[in-house]
Each structure stands twice: as C-alpha cells, then as structure tokens.
UniProtKB/Swiss-Prot annotation:
Protein name as catalogued: Ribulose bisphosphate carboxylase large chain
PTM text: The disulfide bond which can form in the large chain dimeric partners within the hexadecamer appears to be associated with oxidative stress and protein turnover.
GO biological process: photorespiration; reductive pentose-phosphate cycle
UniProt catalytic activity: 2 (2R)-3-phosphoglycerate + 2 H(+) = D-ribulose 1,5-bisphosphate + CO2 + H2O; D-ribulose 1,5-bisphosphate + O2 = 2-phosphoglycolate + (2R)-3-phosphoglycerate + 2 H(+)
Swiss-Prot/TrEMBL site (Transition state stabilizer) positions: K334
Binding-site list for substrate: N123, T173, K177, R295, H327, S379
Major localization class: plastid
Compartment(s) where it occurs, according to its Swiss-Prot or TrEMBL record: Plastid, Chloroplast
Cited PROSITE patterns: RUBISCO_LARGE
Length: 480
C-alpha cells in the first residue's frame, strides 16, 4: 500500500456516490444571523424525493459534487456546506416544493454580487435531477450588506439634489428609441423638459450606434437640459446611457457626463453585468452623479413561474450593487407585473426593513441597515388615464415615466409633457385632500382636463387604450 493510499484510509475516505440528503439535508439546523438564506422553488424529476432534491440544490450550490472526493477530508464541510433546512409543498402543485437553504457567509467574497450569484444561481440550475428550479427570495445578512456601498446616493439625497419633494418624479423615454440624429434627439429632450417633466431618458438599447454616437448625444442633451432649466427654473436631467462594450468605455462615458455637469447617468445592469454596475455605482458616488438602472433582459430570467429567478432577488441584488432608480413594472401598463408581487419588491427597494409577507411574496425578513433606498420606476405603456392608479400604487417615492404617453400627444412633445404634469399635480392634490384615487381617479382627471386643453387632448387620444392580460407570475395562494 502506498503512503498516499494509507493517508486516505486514515481519514476515513470511502470512494463512491451517496445520497445528497445524507450530508446536506439538515432539518434540525437553526440558521445563523450571518447565513445567507435562499428560498428555491424546486420541481424534482419523477421519483426524486423532495429531501433529496432540496439537498442536491444545497450541495451543488455550495461544496458538493456528484461523487465523494478525498479532498473533503482536508476541509470542514460542517463549516462551509450549504444546508437545506426546511421544505414546504407548494399549494396546488403535485410535485413542487419551496426548499429553504442556508449558506455560511464565508462562502462569498465581500462586496461581490457577481460571486454571490455565481454560487447560488450557477450550475445547479442545469442539474438533471430537477425538472425546474427557481430562486424566489434571498435573505441577505447585515454582516454581508455592510460589505457593499449600495446605491450611489439614495432617495433623500436625490430629492435634495433636485429640490423636489412631495410627489412622484416625472420622466419620459425618448421615442423612437432608435434612428434619431443627435440634434433631433436633443430637441425632443428639450421640449419634454420644458413642458414640465423632471427627466427624460435614453432607451435601454441606445448606446453609440452609427446614426447617433454617444458623445454627440451627450452634448445635445446637455444643451437641452440647460436651456430647459433656464426657462422653467427647475432642475432637470436626462438619463445618459453609459452602457458600453467594456467597463473602461462605460467609465469614460460617465466621466464625460460629469464634465458636462449633468445630474444623472444610466446603466443596463443585467446586460452590462454586476461587476460593471458596481464599478459605475462607485464612480457615481465619488463624483456626485445619480444612477438610473434599466432592467433589460430581466424577463428572460424572471418571467417563468417555475424556473429562473424572481425579480425580487434581482431587485435586492441591485440595491447591493448600486443604483438610485430601477424599473419595476407598472401594474397597469403594457408590461408584466401583478400588483401585490410588485408592491412586495417595491418595499424591498425603498424600505429600511421588511417583514415576511406571504401576501406579497416575501419569504424572509430583511434589514438593510444604513443602505440607501432605490426609487422604483414605473414605465411601459402608461398614459394620463393611468396617473391616479400609479400615484396610488407607487406613492411619492417613485418615478413615473411616459414615453409614448408624452411624445404621442397629438399637439407635440411639450404639450404631452404638460398633460402629464397637470395630471400628476391634480392627483397629488386630490390625494392630499383625502380623496380616494382608486375610486375617483377618472373624475379627478376629467376635472383637471376642464382647465388644461393639453390634458383634455391627451384624455381623448388614449381613452380606449388598455392592456388587460392576466399576469404570468402570480402568488401561490391564488391556487388554493
């Protein structure tokens, strides 16, 4: 027998394959305050017990592999392994479970969303023993949160920078999203800001294409911002999309935006990646820029109920990585978003502390300690008739963005902006007077339209426009 063989035998190594549940299913385990907790929606293959499936998820997303390895004896599995500590059947489903997994904090690099996701939502999602797997929620411990900077500035600092309080902020995505020259693009920005909007926005796929290079767009938009500010006396901004093919190019664009003196830049955080996003967030805090986040590609990840990752997890990840705004659906517009679920992750973005709330799909109590909040952005297929519902659903700490609902106005861009500003001010005043926006919303808009011809014209154009399709992702309680 060789010395190597003798060493393996002396530590009790036994080659072969054993059930995951023997090592990674630990129902007696009490999670530590420092553990990262995950709630997975697990759909096992037929014949795979729920305990084995949950344990497999814990193993393959932490220290485990498909067979016993002798190097297990060179470390402490009890210290580093993930543990499936609780399993609940999903109501209304025959073979689907919520499996709760606890991960020791030492498994993750400090301040790195990239590393956290590489482990928790890595290769395990292609595991053959599972028909489907979805990460529903994470509990991020305070000890890990404190290793992140988080949003560059947060809600209160943004309001102070803009000197705007007591109402949602108003925005607009410039349309058509692709094809305009930089000068015509800047003209549209100016008209919308002059009409009463707080922000205008690059669409997510506006980067630096042949028809409009980024530097030209930045210059014309900055000119539009300063001209609109001079005419209105209000602070204005345009989300200049700094997303680029490399991190170096992205930062170069952000540097140029800062040199122009504009207040805010933008990033597509999922297509750009968490490493790039965190780098940009650090630059924005150091240089006084607000950071608007678009979630392009999110529905590829989060829309299917049984597989992928819920947006509430992506929202938590963004708050760690850094962003002052993030798109969060509208509930009433053209994009997917069930009301209770949307309000659940809106709370996660804005509040310092959220409790477990099954009615909103929140699986864990979450403390954000001193991490600044993020403004949710409602955007996508909304117009003036939606204003009462949006004001009631999202409240003051939000951004309401009307792209087609501004630039589609029959009289032009500036009247479209006027219509939205009048509608918003009317809804905020009515709410402050104690009126019920949900019940009286249409009446409030009609009353305001009597003295605003711009709003009256908008009401006429969009009076029949609705997007009434059932949400794909709904709460499990709906099946009971």
């Amino acid at each position: 027998m060789s010395p190597q063989t003798e060493t393996k035998a002396s530590v009790g190594f036994k080659a072969g394959v054993k059930d995951y549940k023997l090592t990674y299913y630990t129902p007696e385990y009490v999670p530590l305050d420092t553990d990262i907790l995950a709630a997975f929606r697990v759909t096992p293959q037929p014949g795979v017990p729920s305990e084995e499936a949950g344990a497999a998820v814990a193993a393959e997303s932490s220290t485990g592999t498909w067979t016993t390895v002798w190097t297990d004896g060179l470390t402490s599995l009890d210290r580093y392994k993930g543990r499936c500590y609780h399993i609940d059947p999903v109501p209304g489903e025959e073979n689907q479970y919520i499996c709760y997994v606890a991960y020791p904090l030492d498994l993750f690099e400090e301040g790195s969303v990239t590393n956290m996701f590489t482990s928790i939502v890595g290769n395990v999602f292609g595991f053959k023993a599972l028909r489907a797997l979805r990460l529903e929620d994470l509990r991020i411990p305070v000890a890990y949160i404190k290793t992140f900077q988080g949003p560059p500035h947060g809600i209160q600092v943004e309001r102070d920078k803009l000197n705007k309080y007591g109402r949602p902020l108003l925005g607009c995505t410039i349309k058509p999203k692709l094809g305009l020259s930089a000068k015509n693009y800047g003209r549209a920005v100016y008209e919308c800001l002059r009409g009463g909007l707080d922000f205008t926005k690059d669409d997510e796929n506006v980067n630096s294409q042949p028809f409009m290079r980024w530097r030209d767009r930045f210059l014309f938009c900055a000119e539009a911002i300063y001209k609109a500010q001079a005419e209105t006396g209000e602070i204005k901004g345009h989300y200049l999309n700094a997303t680029a093919g490399t991190c170096e190019e992205m930062i170069k664009r952000a540097v140029f935006a800062r040199e122009l003196g504009v207040p805010i830049v933008m990033h597509d955080y999922l297509t750009g990646g968490f490493t790039a996003n965190t780098s940009l967030a650090h630059y924005c805090r150091d240089n006084g820029l607000l950071l608007h986040i678009h979630r392009a590609m999110h529905a590829v990840i989060d829309r299917q109920k049984n597989h992928g990752m819920h947006f509430r997890v992506l929202a938590k990840a963004l708050r760690l990585s850094g962003g002052d705004h993030i798109h969060a659906g509208t509930v009433v517009g053209k994009l997917e978003g069930e009301r209770d679920i949307t309000l659940g992750f809106v709370d996660l973005l804005r509040d310092d502390y959220t409790e477990i709330d099954a009615d909103r799909g929140i699986y864990f109590t979450q403390s954000w300690v001193s991490t600044p909040g993020v403004l949710p952005v409602a955007s996508g297929g909304i117009h003036v008739w939606h204003m009462p519902a949006l004001t009631e659903i999202f409240g003051d700490d939000s951004v309401l963005q009307f792209g087609g609902g501004t630039l589609g106005h029959p009289w032009g861009n500036a009247p479209g902006a006027v219509a939205n500003r009048v509608a918003l001010e009317a809804c905020v005043q009515a709410r402050n007077e104690g009126r019920d926006l949900a019940r009286e919303g249409a009446t409030i808009i009609r009353e305001a339209a009597k003295w605003s011809p711009e709003l009256a014209a908008a009401c006429e154009v969009w009076k029949e426009i609705k997007f009434e399709f059932p949400a794909v992702d709904v709460l499990d309680k709906a099946k009971k």
